[in-house]
Structures are given as structure tokens and as C-alpha cells.
Amino acid sequence: LKTGFIGAGKVGFTLGKYLTEHGKKVTGYYSRNTHSAREAAQFTDTKACDSLAELIHESDVLFLTVPDSSITSVYEEIAAHPIRGKYICHCSGEKTSAEAFPDIDKTGAYEYSVHPLFAVSDKYHAYEELPDVFFTIEGNKDHLDGIRGMLSEAGLQTRLIDPADKTRYHAAAAAASNLVIGLLDQSISMLGECGFSEEDARAALTPLVLGNVRHLLRDGTVQALTGPVERSDTETVRKHLASLDSRRDRVLYSLLSLRLADIAQRKHPDRDYTAVEKILEEFAE
């Protein structure tokens, strides 16, 4: 299968480079931003197509690596061309293939959502990390082996997902990738109130955060959990809450700590967490 990319941003750069490096044929790129298309083509040793029609004609698989808000409008442009038998894919974590490509069955093309569970931050180096990344796929069941097989042959890990689960799946990804940034930003701010510079706060937190994540990934959340909630240390929890100046920070601390109490109960089924939960529930609303 020959793959073409419409849109030449970070995801298009990354996936195109990975596929070419792993023996897959990439026809090239088309973008309204001709400079980005040429840059991506040079990076992947492919070509920048002069027209959408050229890329469509030369490709069996089309990845629409454009912003989520543009996917459907770009697809509608594609649908005006002969696309019967082609795989039309987007990389949005939130949109299903049916939402992104309405009435695609009328064109004879096959629709897929192919989402890398990964934050692409550097378009020149992120492709090196893709072997460790899960790609979730949903779409046309009759031709699933084609798109999944191409990715698997290139050494990528794939997992099928039910379209009905797509939004919850995306929320889970956001919790791990985005919400944790907010939590760490709060921690850095609190250390700043204790006299740390931002640079020193990040340096101080690095071994704590990385060690905790390594433990969690190796042994699971139950075994990784430590701290005052796990010990049912009500005095320390009260002091923590008293030290937080804003109601929003106290609510955040309490809601997350209630989740920790659930984990702690699984770790210590015979331990009573009623007292600490009662304290946390006072501040959780």
C-alpha cells in the first residue's frame, strides 16, 4: 500500500518518516502550506505534490493529518475525486471515523481512525519513539486487515477500539497526558511559595515524579501508592488542606485523594479509611 499525507504538521512528519524508515512506500505530501509540504517531503525523502488530485491518484492510503476542526472539510474535498477502494484515515483521538467522514460509503472508500496514543512534540525526532506507541484503530470492519496489517508490518503496535468508547478513551489519554501537567504545575507553584525558583522546583520534583511513574508502570497503581492517604494519616491530610490557600486547590487535593483512598482500600482491604474519607469529602464539593 502506498501512503500519502494531506497536511504536513507534526503528526504527518512523524508518521511519514517512520513508515519510510521501515520499508513502507510513502508517495508524498500535499498541503495548502507549500513550504511545509516541501519540508516534510525533504525530511522523508518523498515528494511534495502540486495538487490534491495528484496525491490521491498516486496513493492507496490517505492520512488526513490536519487539525481536528479541518478533517471533515478536507475529506469533503477528497470525496469529490475518485477514491473508491482507498483507505481514508485521520489521526484524531476524539473523532470517530464515521463522524469525520460522513457518507463515505457512497464513495466506495474505507474509513479509519488511526490514533497514536502519544504526544508528538518534536516533528524531527518523535518518529524514533513510535515503536513504543500504541495506535488505536476503528473503522470499516471489512477491510481492517489492510490498514492494520500495514502498520503492524512496519513494527507498530495496534489495538482495536469500539467507536462508542472513543470519547472516554480520549478523556483517559487527556488525563494521563494533559491533566497531569496541571497537577505538576500546582506542585511547582506550591514549592515556589516555599521559596523555590521554578527551575529548582522542577529539578527537585524530577526524581520523585520519574521514580513514581516507573514504579506505577512496573507494578501498577496499587503497589505504587504511598503517602498519608495510603497510611490513613488524618492529621497530615488535615494539615495539607489547611496549607492550601484557594478553595479550588483544596477541592482538587480532596477529589484526587478520594481516588487514592479507593486505591488504598484495594491495597489494604482490612484497613478502615472512613475517617480520612470523611475529611476529604468535606472539601470535595
Question: Where is each model-derived feature located?
Answer:
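Short phosphate-binding/catalytic loops that engage adenosine nucleotides
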Residues: 24-25, 109, 156, 196
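NAD(P)+-binding Rossmann beta1-loop-alpha1 motif at the extreme N-terminus of oxidoreductases
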Residues: 1-58
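Short, basic/aromatic-enriched C-terminal tail that caps enzymatic domains
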Residues: 40, 270-285
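Internal alpha-helical scaffold of NAD(P)-dependent oxidoreductase catalytic cores
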Residues: 39-43, 126-218, 280
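Rossmann-like NAD(P)(H) cofactor-binding subdomain of soluble oxidoreductases
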Residues: 47-125
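Short, hydrophobic beta-strand segments that form beta-sheet elements in well-ordered domains
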Residues: 27-31, 88-90, 135-138
